[in-house]
Amino acid sequence: MTIMRKTHPLMKMVNHAFIDLPTPSNISGWWNFGSLLGVCLVIQIASGLFLAMHYTPDTLTAFSSVTHICRDVNYGWLIRYMHANGASLFFICLYLHXGRGIYYGSYSYMETWNIGIILLFLTMATAFMGYVLPWGQMSFWGATVITNLLSAIPYIGTDLVEWIWGGFSVDKATLNRFFAFHFILPFIIAAMAMVHLLFLHETGSNNPLGIPSDCDKIPFPPYYTTKDFLGVVLLLAFFFTLVLFFPDLLGDPDNYSPANPLNTPPHIKPEWYFLFAYAILRSIPNKLGGVIALVXSXLXLALIPHIQTAKQRSLMFRPISQLXFWLLVSDVLVLTWIGGQPVEPPFIIIGQIASIXYFTIILVLMPIAGIIENKMLKW
């Protein structure tokens, strides 16, 4: 008798994706982040669903409904902090996952990489709209500043901004539509993650050596299910330490004040995971130039497969490219720090230097390093 998981139409799909899946025998802990992102998405959708049951997307009651969740709903404070810190955890895993893709040359799988970039943009959009919903000071002013950037688009900019706002300023209509989009986007992310997996399983996983591993594959369970489970346990330990002991560590105190259109906070800034892009935006004095740089900061990832010059796929045995990669990581950390600082000397010039360095490393240094390494290996 044939096994049901190999014959049943639905089970067969799951079987090919998770059970009878040949996997390279040497993939390291850096390959855990895909499954960890799946766990983060489940946490976010589950906690978000319970929050949506008690939240009201109205300018008069949004802030007090969040307060009500924290004070009156059973374990509402826990659900709210899980959702808020779950977003931070999601982005930590997302950036590490993308960094691993750059380091080990996973961008060679073009379809998987491009879907991953779309997933990054969708997640950023979802997180931005979610940050607006509590209707605190930083929610309101963050929404005003970021949506206003679209007015830099020539000719249609102003009309586009008013169309998104649903009026002449960020108001009830804006909050309502942001709530609707924030609710639907995670399900689109889940669907896109399925497509991401579909393309990945067409080619099979990459490995740290960046070489074909068809001659040395092992089954996914029990080896990598155990490994993924360990990753999930460590992730949840870190997550609940954050949620239960330091719930406001990554938040902004200004968001505990209700939104007031008549009072601007001294320093408007987004959540920490957008600070690197925000620093790039601020470092260009021209509005349209800043918006272009902001979009290009994440779009540059899509260029990496097209501008890579090295004959070796992974950076494991390429010390010059490794140097450029870790310079890029350091640069992103500097940009994140600068994004949270006020716009005054010396932070302005540091931000401008770091922004130039960011694009130079990705577009110039990495390809040059690849060419030099090819020459050194006489390829």
From Swiss-Prot:
One of its GO terms (biological process) is mitochondrial electron transport, ubiquinol to cytochrome c. The keyword Glycoprotein does not apply. Heme b b562 binds at H83, H182. Binds 2 heme b groups non-covalently. Heme b b566 binds at H97, H196. The chain crosses the membrane at residues 33-53, 77-98, 113-133, 178-198, 226-246, 288-308, 320-340, 347-367. It is found in: Mitochondrion inner membrane. Keywords: Electron transport, Heme, Iron, Membrane, Metal-binding, Mitochondrion, Mitochondrion inner membrane, Respiratory chain, Transmembrane, Transmembrane helix, Transport, Ubiquinone. CDD domains: cytochrome_b_C, Cytochrome_b_N. A ubiquinone binds at H201. InterPro entries: Cyt_b/b6_C, Cyt_b/b6_C_sf, Cyt_b/b6_N, Cytb/b6-like_sf, Cytochrome_b, Cytochrome_b_C_euk/bac, Cytochrome_b_N_euk/bac, Di-haem_cyt_TM. Gene3D superfamilies: Cytochrome Bc1 Complex, Chain C. Its cofactor is heme b. GO terms for molecular function: metal ion binding; ubiquinol-cytochrome-c reductase activity. SUPFAM superfamilies: a domain/subunit of cytochrome bc1 complex (Ubiquinol-cytochrome c reductase), Transmembrane di-heme cytochromes. One of its GO terms (cellular component) is mitochondrial inner membrane. It is a multi-pass membrane protein. Belongs to the cytochrome b family. The cytochrome bc1 complex contains 11 subunits: 3 respiratory subunits (MT-CYB, CYC1 and UQCRFS1), 2 core proteins (UQCRC1 and UQCRC2) and 6 low-molecular weight proteins (UQCRH/QCR6, UQCRB/QCR7, UQCRQ/QCR8, UQCR10/QCR9, UQCR11/QCR10 and a cleavage product of UQCRFS1). This cytochrome bc1 complex then forms a dimer. Heme 1 (or BL or b562) is low-potential and absorbs at about 562 nm, and heme 2 (or BH or b566) is high-potential and absorbs at about 566 nm. Component of the ubiquinol-cytochrome c reductase complex (complex III or cytochrome b-c1 complex) that is part of the mitochondrial respiratory chain. The b-c1 complex mediates electron transfer from ubiquinol to cytochrome c. Contributes to the generation of a proton gradient across the mitochondrial membrane that is then used for ATP synthesis. This is Cytochrome b.
